[in-house]
């Protein structure tokens, strides 16, 4: 019924939750009549949710069923074990279990809403056919009757692993799923762009990356191997991963570790730096080629307290990255002596 009401005025409602925040997205037509109706519905949902008992029960059942199904999948098992090994008791290391969801009642949801969905902690980003004055009016209208709760306290700092660890979990899957990595960095870290370039060379650049050359091209251990850094308000994970035949799992782990270690020790070549920077600079327009992508970038800038000219200076920041900066960033954010490794499905 709710989504039909949005569809009737040509609007779409979306949202999501990650380790740091919940988000609610509204996409609407620019015409005043449809826009205002959609905005009124959106505001009603945000400011006066009633959390009906029957809907809560239905959603709990849906989430529990999804969790139980996911818990049988090797990629989910690997991800949960890796996250727990990396972050321990920190909130970033928590994954919901069916019994956690089962205990939630309507009072819990209402209390969480009243303490975490206040105007003080909200970030509102708007893009489209509107004046600045209109945007300010819309933002004021959206935030006006949100709960008057204090801004939630920031999460505690992440504790780093004290030693390297390797966890092996049996599973009947035909392939072994491998994850390894280390806590990476916060989004506002000065090393963001050097590590961004370094990761592109190591495993973020697809078929031109070091990991693909060593794992796939030279040894045929996997079709795909990758790495990425996922910075949050606190230090997020740096992850390298792949799938391979079970009989090759030991070799694959060894090759990944050696490739990452060599890259951290010696850094990229001049040729790799030139190619990576050119690809990232030339690919920047694809990050902002739609209103949706621009909105996501603007919201991220506001949420992470980044400079307002972040998008304007993005390419210049990439151009300015030196090989020495990449080398220093890799050594500062990847400690091979404390690397976490998880293998699901190994013999």
Tell what function each PLM region has.
Residues 1-45, 60, 64, 74-99, ...:
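M16 family metallopeptidases and their MPP-like homologs
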Residues 316, 325-328:
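Mature hydrolase/peptidase catalytic cores and their serpin-fold inhibitory cores, especially
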Residues 101-105:
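Short, charged, amphipathic alpha-helices and their helix-cap/turn boundaries
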Residues 92-93, 119, 123-188, 343-347:
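An aromatic/glycine/proline-enriched structural segment found at the starts
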């Amino acid at each position: 019924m709710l989504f039909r009401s949005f569809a009737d005025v040509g609007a779409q409602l979306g949202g999501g939750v990650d380790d740091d925040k919940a988000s609610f997205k509204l996409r609407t037509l620019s015409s005043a009549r449809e826009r205002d109706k959609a905005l009124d519905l959106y505001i009603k949902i945000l400011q006066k949710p009633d959390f009906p008992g029957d809907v809560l029960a239905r959603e709990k059942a849906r989430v529990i069923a999804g969790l139980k199904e996911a818990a049988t999948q090797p990629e989910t098992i690997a991800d949960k074990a890796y996250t727990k090994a990396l972050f321990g008791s920190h909130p970033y290391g928590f994954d919901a279990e069916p019994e956690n969801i089962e205990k939630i009642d309507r009072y819990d949801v209402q209390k969480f809403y009243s303490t975490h969905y206040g105007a003080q902690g909200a970030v509102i980003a708007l893009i489209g056919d509107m004046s600045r004055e209109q945007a300010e009016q819309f933002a004021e209208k959206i935030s006006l009757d949100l709960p008057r709760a204090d801004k939630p306290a920031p999460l505690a700092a992440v504790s780093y692993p004290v030693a390297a660890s390797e966890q092996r979990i049996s599973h009947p899957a035909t392939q072994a799923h491998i994850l390894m990595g280390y806590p990476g960095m916060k989004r506002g870290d000065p090393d963001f762009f050097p590590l961004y370039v370094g990761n592109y060379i190591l495993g973020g650049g697809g078929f031109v990356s070091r990991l693909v050359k060593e794992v796939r091209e030279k040894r045929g251990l996997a079709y795909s191997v990758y790495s990425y850094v996922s910075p949050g308000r606190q230090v997020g994970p740096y992850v390298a991963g792949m799938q391979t035949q079970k009989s090759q799992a030991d070799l694959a782990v060894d090759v990944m570790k050696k490739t990452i270690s060599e890259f951290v020790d010696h850094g990229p070549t001049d040729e790799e730096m030139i190619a990576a920077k050119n690809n990232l600079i030339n690919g920047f327009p694809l990050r902002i080629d739609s209103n949706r992508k621009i909105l996501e970038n603007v919201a991220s800038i506001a949420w992470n307290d980044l400079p307002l000219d972040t998008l304007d200076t993005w390419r210049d920041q990439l151009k300015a990255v030196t090989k020495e900066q990449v080398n220093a960033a890799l050594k500062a954010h990847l400690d091979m002596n404390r690397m976490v490794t998880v293998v699901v499905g190994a013999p």
